[in-house]
């Protein structure tokens, strides 16, 4: 009998063996913040390319951005159109305007996160009202597990309504406060809130302030959950339902993030969303031929530059003109009076930037950025220097961590009004600094194969967890922690009791 050759065996395994391992997966993807959408879509596409049956609930909060899904490998997309209430809430652009004007204090983060929470809540309520569109299409399918990012928490209710208890939590940033708290991974007294401006550690005098940042995220979660739990008719709170999750994957890298307590069911996959750079178009090549030093300026898609306060715009343009030998390429999303007035000289305005292509060209001397997680990882991968101006959310923490890890300089948002401070920051960011360059080179080298490594880690972990395993381990028996609100109440009660006691002692001693 003739033995099968090695190529024949490989062909049989790839074409007939893989389907035996095929899993049916439900992915919940709210279309709201582009970087989050891209991260979740990348995971869905990866699983589809692997041969798994992937169904995506595409909950469209913003129709102006793509869902980033590869329809050639996705089995089914259940699309939920934008709620009229959500369209109305987003139309006035009050949220990005607030991002530009707010201070990074717990009360202000709480206020703007509540605005976001209400938008997610309204869209989820609309989704629930579309019973026939969503649940009737999905209830006849048997899913092995679900995948969602616990930012918009509608996915928790969808999974519970469909009887999906096994799930994977994603985070396109670092670990989210409420998730860490709900799963019992580590205490809020130890961990800097993702909304805070603390890095690897919290100073003693900052403990209460950090707890208030944690409380702001809890409020964002509860703005949604308090209404959605009865709407989905869940038998347990959304917070408790999170504990049935089996795995969590974070868009972080150990050399670029803070050190913190960990769990064996939590994995870092920073770099999994890296894109392959394309050759630069002639317009950029021609620009680069005119200048030896190029500075890229972009504050992300959620906080467009045209909504920036005028005083910041004027400071930046005046400062840029003080560097005549540098070309500044500024992502500015519309033509307006400001761009018309400042088109001359060494500043070029672009509504869209091929950011990865520009960074990987090795022509960029400095990237002035808002410090979003994806942007930072892409920049570190390209070994490009950054000047971070954090605006909202996790960006303040990202900036502080990068500063503490010797990877970047930081220019605070309110400093954008001071031309001398902006000038000094750009000068510092472009001057010789061997320690900074060595740190960036080390991180860049470690990120070189991060995409492939992260993809392999994700696929191997997910497949080993859910293939032929009816009861994979979860977070159900992890310790239950006090909430940030409870700890704040205890601390404030102790402080009030102590103050009252001291007051009584002083009164008795000096007045009686």
From Swiss-Prot:
Q: Name one GO molecular function term.
A: glucuronosyltransferase activity
Enzyme Commission no: 2.4.1.17
Q: State where the protein is found.
A: Membrane
| Membrane topology qualifier | Single-pass membrane protein
**Keywords assigned by UniProt?**
Glycosyltransferase, Membrane, Signal, Transferase, Transmembrane, Transmembrane helix
Q: Which reaction does it catalyse?
A: glucuronate acceptor + UDP-alpha-D-glucuronate = acceptor beta-D-glucuronoside + UDP + H(+)
Q: Which residues cross the membrane?
A: 487-507
Please give the GO cellular component terms listed in this UniProt entry: membrane
Write the signal peptide boundaries: 1-22
Q: Which family does it belong to?
A: Belongs to the UDP-glycosyltransferase family.
What PANTHER family would the database entry show?
A: EG:EG0003.4 PROTEIN-RELATED, UDP-GLUCURONOSYLTRANSFERASE UGT-55-RELATED
Q: Kindly provide the name given to this protein in its UniProt entry.
A: Putative UDP-glucuronosyltransferase ugt-55
Q: Please give the organism.
A: Caenorhabditis elegans
| Organism lineage string | Eukaryota, Metazoa, Ecdysozoa, Nematoda, Chromadorea
Annotated gene = ugt-55
